């Protein structure tokens, strides 16, 4: 059977009921209701290789610290609090992948486009009393195009090579906050293994990770 088709949908209900024994005035609750669809079409090119087109949705629900409305004042002019009206962050992804598995080479290549229309971000504003407020909102729109490759190659009976690499371009925008950022990112990891006499192994490996791109800038590497 060369063609394959799978589809599905699930419903998720999540609830939080947060209670503070010593500070009942800080108690709060939150419910999330989400419908999550998925679909995939695959085609077998041979007994050892296939291509696949798929769609899926991933959920990222905000945690307690993002939702907690209790106000914390670091100074008289600086207050921070969560936003109990936050909704589940939903990432939609469309992918095209190619797989081949042989005695010598295993390879997976994946091209993907994903987008989020309600990403959660922290932001600050100064109110009419001159107090700086720090909280969260579903204000980020993200588009990401990526390509990833994973390969395992048995060069000889005693020599093997593994490669994991990915690259992406991301565009983040927030109309509400008047901010935007974009750029390229990616990571690379490679490993060479050589079996030696006397049951010894020699392994060499290395990698690189590009800085993480967020609405506020870049961080890490």
What do these predicted ranges mean?
Residues 1, 35-41, 51, 92-96, ...:
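Hydrophobic, lipid-facing positions within transmembrane beta-strands of outer-membrane proteins
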Residues 1-26, 32-38, 42, 47-92, 113-134, 158-169, 212, ...:
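Surface-exposed extracellular loop regions of Gram-negative outer-membrane beta-barrel proteins
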Residues 3, 41-43, 57, 98-100, ...:
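Residue-level signature of outer-membrane beta-barrel architecture
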Residues 13-21, 29-31, 59-65, 70, ...:
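Gram-negative outer-membrane beta-barrel proteins
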Residues 22-31, 83-87, 138, 213-220:
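Outer-membrane beta-barrel proteins
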Residues 44, 48-54, 106-109, 202-204:
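Acidic/polar loop patches that form or flank catalytic/metal-binding clefts of enzymes
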Residues 81-83, 87, 102-164, 169, ...:
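Outer membrane beta-barrel strand-and-loop segments of large Gram-negative receptors
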